[in-house]
Design a protein with these regions (language model features):
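Duplex nucleic acid-engaging cores and interfaces of nucleic-acid transaction enzymes
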Residues: 1-206
Length: 207
């Protein structure tokens, strides 16, 4: 189905559903045009997700505009007797968000510790208003990267839906994982630096 994906991407005037009719092949598991388009979508989404230039653009965008978000995960089932006390340590982060570009290292480490202990669900998001935008700003960046826009051509809407699928299914979690690892490393380096400075001051002050 790669030829179908390439055809639609190269010629936006093509009707995707009509083009897909030519790729129906029951023996290969492509029962109808919709199945052919699903396969073509997956091929393009995978290609998009592996584009290093695009990934860097999205990573930089989410790093600059994104917020670290944490929410309380309600504990269920049999829990240790001190489970509530353990959760209470992270109460300041039960409903929390702060810009990645501004959040201090100690808060980053606290949030990530809460996630490790199963108390907090953690994500990287844009502002609530931006997250509700349709298309999502990240989807718009993907579309812009490939010169895809709604101009009335037959393939425009289908290609925009591929951008949406690529972000939601292929790229979002991957970019989020990269950013969480990046801020964790930065926060740990800062914490080590602060500890070293404090230890130095303590040793210099010793009689």
């Amino acid at each position: 189905l790669e030829p179908l994906a390439d055809l639609i991407l190269a010629d936006r005037t093509v009707d995707p559903m009509a083009a897909a009719e030519n790729f129906i092949n029951a023996e290969k598991g492509v029962a109808d045009a919709a199945s052919a388009l699903t396969g073509a979508r997956d091929i393009l989404a995978e290609r998009i997700s592996l584009d290093p230039g695009l990934r860097e653009t999205l990573r930089e965008f989410m790093s600059t505009r994104g917020e670290l978000v944490s929410k309380w995960v309600e504990l269920g089932g049999d829990q240790p007797a001190d489970a509530d006390a353990q959760s209470a340590k992270f109460k300041d982060y039960f409903e929390f968000r702060e810009a990645l570009s501004k959040i201090p290292s100690h808060r980053v480490l606290a949030v990530l510790r809460g996630r490790r202990e199963g108390v907090l669900a953690v994500s990287v998001e844009l502002t609530p208003d931006e997250e509700l935008q349709s298309p999502h700003p990240a989807e718009s960046l993907i579309a812009k990267h490939y010169g895809i826009e709604r101009t009335g051509r037959l393939a425009d809407d289908w290609l925009l839906s591929v951008c949406r699928w690529a972000w939601r299914v292929k790229l979002r979690l991957s970019i989020e994982t990269d950013l969480l690892e990046e801020i964790r490393e930065r926060a740990e380096e800062t914490a080590i630096g602060v500890f070293g400075e404090n230890l130095r001051d303590l040793l210099l002050a010793a009689p």
